[in-house]
């Protein structure tokens, strides 16, 4: 069966980028997450997951922990400040020790290079739980939410408005991988990285739109989903005051939402700053799917862990 074949290809793998997945593998994970969400599939995975987080986390930490518990496994929280990593032990040494204790590790760190270095030395699955470059688990949840809302991903357009950050990068890659039209509207100086855009265009194979714009209204026109994130990510708090006037025209509000498809949904990876990147009326409005989107982190990560570890 195709599903079983795809699970076999995922077993023991790393997920450092959404582009590490084939289209069939990504679709399989969404299907499995949807089945797990309604209780149709409940694999047991009595393994141990380590969480090595150098950045604050609510949804990612809790959803990974609950997912592992629901699979019958256990979680160890590895705060860098309470391990030898915080005292300067080389990451390569830590990786080679932890892979003898753990069955997988999810890492939230600043640099993608640190994540890659750990994965190079660890023999267990390494999962990107967020870096400054990408946030692949978030995007799996986003795509599941989009598919739930419309019944399909075919022919849909997702419009991301705001900072061309890690979420924008993974949205570009994930949407291109699954054939969803993706538009990103950012101030020119905060556009997504050029190499990510080029990679997304290559993944799309010219079969779906991959567009980077500076005009949020043009980007939002006719879109099936409007998506935003904070204007200053973790580690950029000192820049928030300078960024605010630059990003103000990129706020998702009722006016911008009116330009989208009448059935459009609103997404935000959270935490949200109400009346900054998104107005409270839109965040709490009838087209918002933000809370469903947050819930879906649990289901896609449970599907991912089961596929990598069972």
UniProtKB/Swiss-Prot annotation:
Do the record's keywords include Amino-acid biosynthesis?
Answer: yes
Biological processes, Gene Ontology terms: arginine biosynthetic process via ornithine; citrulline biosynthetic process; L-arginine biosynthetic process
Which EC numbers characterise this protein's activity in its record?
Answer: 2.1.3.3
Q: Which residues bind carbamoyl phosphate?
A: 57-60, 84, 108, 135-138, 269-270, 297
Transmembrane regions: none
Q: Which reaction does it catalyse?
A: carbamoyl phosphate + L-ornithine = L-citrulline + phosphate + H(+)
Q: Which GO terms describe its molecular function?
A: amino acid binding; ornithine carbamoyltransferase activity
The listed locations are:
Cytoplasm
Report keywords, A-Z: Amino-acid biosynthesis, Arginine biosynthesis, Cytoplasm, Transferase
User: What single Pfam family name could you report for this chain, choosing any that match?
Assistant: OTCace
Pathway field = Amino-acid biosynthesis; L-arginine biosynthesis; L-arginine from L-ornithine and carbamoyl phosphate: step 1/3
- What is one cellular component GO term in this UniProt entry? cytoplasm
Superkingdom of origin: Bacteria
- Name the enzyme's class: transferase
Q: Which residues bind L-ornithine?
A: 166, 229, 233-234
Q: Which PANTHER family match?
A: ORNITHINE CARBAMOYLTRANSFERASE, MITOCHONDRIAL (PTHR45753), ORNITHINE TRANSCARBAMYLASE, MITOCHONDRIAL (PTHR45753:SF3)
Instruction: State the function annotated in the UniProt record.
Output: Reversibly catalyzes the transfer of the carbamoyl group from carbamoyl phosphate (CP) to the N(epsilon) atom of ornithine (ORN) to produce L-citrulline.
Q: Cross-referenced NCBIfam families, in alphabetical order?
A: orni_carb_tr, PRK00779.1
Q: Which family does it belong to?
A: Belongs to the aspartate/ornithine carbamoyltransferase superfamily. OTCase family.
What is this protein called in UniProt? Ornithine carbamoyltransferase
Q: Which gene encodes it?
A: argF
């Amino acid at each position: 069966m195709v599903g079983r074949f795809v699970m076999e290809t995922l077993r023991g793998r790393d997920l450092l980028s959404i582009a590490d997945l084939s289209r069939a593998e990504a679709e399989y994970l969404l299907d499995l997450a949807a089945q797990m969400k309604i209780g149709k599939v409940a694999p047991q995975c009595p393994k141990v997951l380590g969480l090595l987080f150098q950045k604050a986390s609510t949804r990612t930490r809790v959803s990974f922990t609950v997912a592992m518990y629901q699979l019958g496994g256990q979680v160890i929280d590895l705060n860098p400040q309470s391990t030898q990593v915080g005292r300067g032990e080389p990451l390569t040494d830590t990786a080679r020790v932890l892979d003898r204790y753990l069955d997988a590790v999810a890492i939230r760190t600043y640099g993608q290079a640190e994540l890659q270095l750990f994965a190079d030395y660890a023999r267990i699955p390494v999962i990107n739980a967020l870096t400054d470059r990408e946030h692949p688990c978030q995007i799996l949840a986003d795509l599941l939410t989009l598919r739930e809302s419309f019944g399909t991903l075919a022919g849909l357009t997702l419009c991301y408005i705001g900072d061309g950050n890690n979420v924008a990068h993974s949205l570009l890659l994930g949407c291109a991988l699954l054939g969803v039209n993706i538009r990103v509207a950012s101030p020119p100086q905060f556009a997504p990285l050029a190499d990510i855009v080029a990679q997304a265009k290559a993944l799309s194979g010219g079969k779906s739109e991959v567009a980077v714009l500076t005009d949020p209204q043009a980007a939002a026109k006719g879109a099936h989903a409007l998506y935003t994130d904070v204007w200053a990510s973790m580690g950029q708090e000192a820049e928030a005051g300078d960024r605010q006037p630059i990003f103000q025209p990129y706020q998702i509000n009722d006016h911008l939402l009116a330009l989208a498809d009448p059935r459009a949904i609103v997404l935000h990876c959270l935490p949200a700053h109400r009346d900054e990147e998104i107005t409270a009326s839109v965040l709490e409005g009838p087209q918002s799917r933000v809370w469903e989107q947050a819930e879906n982190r649990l289901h896609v990560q449970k599907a991912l862990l089961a596929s990598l570890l069972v």
